[in-house]
């Protein structure tokens, strides 16, 4: 070891610097008692934004519980003012890229040895719901310099997020191993890792990468133009199994690419030793409300279709994540003290690319954009076991469930995410399976025609009729504003009265709901404006205009036809309640005309005009040449999943207040998609299939139960605190 520098971090003596990045420095170190050599990554937390800090801590929370010989071990985390030190396993052999530079073309037997170890590590990650989105030789470390060294997967999100991405590194590093669907900013899933594995194997046995280019654009063009994988003429001695594996991993269309199960069982890796699943899983303790983390990794198709239930990728760039990104559930595979399970398997032809209509479901997320952000974490509920107990069918019309695809918000974000935490993916289907053609897969295949989650058929754009199931009286509500609370203020204010799949027949109740939907969706617009995603913001803003237009239509229809029998009665109740609860509110209904709707209509008109002005401003910022308008409904759906994911992260981290806020907004968006969106004046109109409705109801039910759990927990905690205070007062007296 290099000369001791005199620095001490925890129980470790710090030696020479062995690496550095924009926000981190890596040091060689030695335990001062037993002499164990380690690598210490020193991260300057004050240089990370809040999202990166959360993603980093979330990833650490997960990775500390993975113990496998083919994954770099996180030994300890040491905090100091302004810094976090990650104590990592030290690998004397350096990384695989150095090995390749030193040896050139490696014997097939050696390549097989490394591939078997890489496969074992990937299987562990997959069983723990982790997608490593930056597999390349530089991120594969070797325990020694020998040909039989242990290979260890490293840099789970930290390196990508913390290191500068200069042009040279961008062109010479990740893109050479990056799946084409990622470079094209399409939806992608764990199969992107398999492309990277194929590129690494190809380089090991041929001495060069499968595709090259003078720029990333040219590299992508070369991949797209290729019709088959070409091996150099001096590689005639490669076995058929090796060639077959390379060809099947490097399929441009991820739908045609091998599934993970097919990869793990490929003849080229057939003599790989199996590992103990129980040891590789996250050692997360079970908490009430969460599925156990030790669930079996193998699931049949029926179970898988149901377990797809909460595709929250804690990936945040989302986003994830994820994380990110990402966490646990007592009733799920991962757990939190509240009840969210994070399933254990990742792959998916599903999460892959999810182009709904014109847009793809996006991250990130990345979930945790960074790691856990990057980690897209999907929370799976107890619904599967509950259904089995009730003997309800577990299969859906289309076996694939809505899997939140790893969102690729922008190229830099997508590159900054190293792995995604997702809830257990559906059982792998052979690459030749016809299942990919099923009509409403949430997971969209990146190379195949877009598969729509929401069926958008062009038809008349006339105002939708005001129909709906019977609802409770609106007398409990004040004015449109007096009882309204911003979506982020309290998770106890969520109104689920419209969750019967049909809008309320009470005009004021429905208008109030529309207003809350618009306010929540408006947050998405401003988030995208801040991220310079003006086209996406404009698309969502048009949906908000449709909401307010529907509200105006309700007012006009009520005034003309008295649809609810006695409209003035509801209006008067509203006015009475408003005067009682908020006599000083500038927004209350103070002067109603004979039909009672004039003032409310005026308020809505003013809001509608404001939204039009914002839409006009957004339209000015859209660059010419943008021919495809993102699908606002898909964007809203993705946002709901991201919010649910973030709520799960907050819940696991013990921040129940914010968890409830995120759950509340997620439910509101999902209820909007289920109840109101199909009724809006959209072109083309939104049409939901029964299977999509079922999924939306499932998500709403799950998140609503999480909300109820948090509220119950808070009431219980408050009661205990009050009891303790009374007991203390009694003792003092």
Curated annotation (Swiss-Prot):
CDD domains xref list: STKc_ATG1_ULK_like
What PROSITE patterns does the record tag this protein with? PROTEIN_KINASE_ATP, PROTEIN_KINASE_DOM, PROTEIN_KINASE_ST
Give the species: Arabidopsis thaliana (Mouse-ear cress)
Q: Does the keyword Kinase apply?
A: yes
In this chain, the stretch annotated as Disordered covers: 292-363, 379-414, 565-596, 713-733
Q: Catalytic residues per the record?
A: 134
The name of this protein is: Serine/threonine-protein kinase ATG1c
- The entry's ATP-binding residues are 18-26, 41
